[in-house]
Amino acid sequence: MKMLSDFQAGATVKYHGEPCIVLEHRKDGTLLMVLEQIEHTFGSDNNFAKSDLREHLNGAYMDTLTQGNHGEILKRAIDLTAVNGSKQYGIDTCCIAPLTFDEYRKYHDIIPKPEKWEWSVTPWSTPCVDGDETWVMGLLTSGDGGGSYCTSTYGSRPAFLLPSNYVVEPENALASYTTRELVEELFSRADE
């Protein structure tokens, strides 16, 4: 077991048994992204702050991910600036959200390509610019960006912020032991 601050960006750790990738160490904590996609619709329009996806991620999904320990996850500010620069939706503050399109670009070199198309929180445009409230940007299986209609059902590998001193286990926790050491440990436990 190690503190999150001991892991480099790109490392895989387990949070309550869920494999996550370390994206970045920030002043206010460490940003992680879940590696297993969940599927969900985005919502009735492209504003993440009032979307079905946000409600699900910060409700039932958060209950499961944290095993009821909601206080472990820190709130973070989510920039909902559209691809065309519209700031109509402003900043949303929540605990769990997909990455922004800018964050996908920032972490492109360490994020594995998705198994299926997945949502970002970034709208293509907003109603005040051209009346569009339907298109949301996302990540294709090729790693390229693209847009899709908000009422569709696609994947999400949500991100969340934990205190950097939070203790987690590396995904390959047993990899540091030799086979001999593991077998000896098993035999010593069998003798107890």
Question: How would you name each of these model-derived features?
Answer:
Residues 171-192:
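Short, low-complexity, charged amphipathic interaction modules
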Residues 1-173:
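Collagenous Gly-X-Y triple-helix signature in extracellular proteins
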